[in-house]
Amino acid sequence: MKRPFSIVALLLLGFNAAAAAEATLLECIAVVESGQNRKAVGKAGERGMYQVGKAAWDDANERLKREGHHHFQWSKWRDATAQDMIAAAHLRTIRENFKRIGKPDPSPEQLALVWNVGWSGAVSRRFAPNDYAERVGNLFRSQKVLTR
């Protein structure tokens, strides 16, 4: 698997073992979502290699603003750093939601499930992984990555 995660994004996020694991998970999501195609456009208008929709992009952008990071307009979706920063912010929001319900260490499959079907969809499935989530989880575990 190639390593397309932006060096700029890693520097902005602070490179450590946890950030490396997050970057690896996001790369696995990108493989399953688009084959790591940064120019990909989904059937429902999702954009980039992580296939982020407009609403998730806007939510992630708000998070970046709150955290004091640069934010990225939807029109900049083709920019590699924008895609990586938005994806990382979206993943932090997903993790935060798990912590809020008392699950501080969700599995890669649970994180991928929420990425794929949204929080409400994942809750309605009781976080049981679908094929997409299992593919992401298997790919993640096949990578040599330092975990938390």
Regions found by a protein language model. Give the residues of each.
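Sec-dependent signal peptide recognition
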Residues: K2-L10
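Short, functionally critical alpha-helical segments immediately adjacent to catalytic or ligand/cofactor-binding
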Residues: E22-N37, V52, A87-A88, L111-W119
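Solvent-exposed, acidic/flexible segments
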Residues: E22-A23, G42-Y50, K76-D84, P104-P108, ...
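N-terminal, post-signal-peptide region of Sec/Tat-exported proteins
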Residues: V41-E67
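Short, low-complexity, polybasic intrinsically disordered segments
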Residues: W115, V123-Q143
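Alpha-helical segment that forms one wall of the substrate-binding/catalytic cleft
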Residues: D58-A122, G137
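Extracytoplasmic and endomembrane cell-envelope/extracellular-matrix remodeling and assembly machinery
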Residues: A18, E22, R141-R148
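Hydrophobic h-region of N-terminal signal peptides that target proteins for export
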Residues: L10-A18
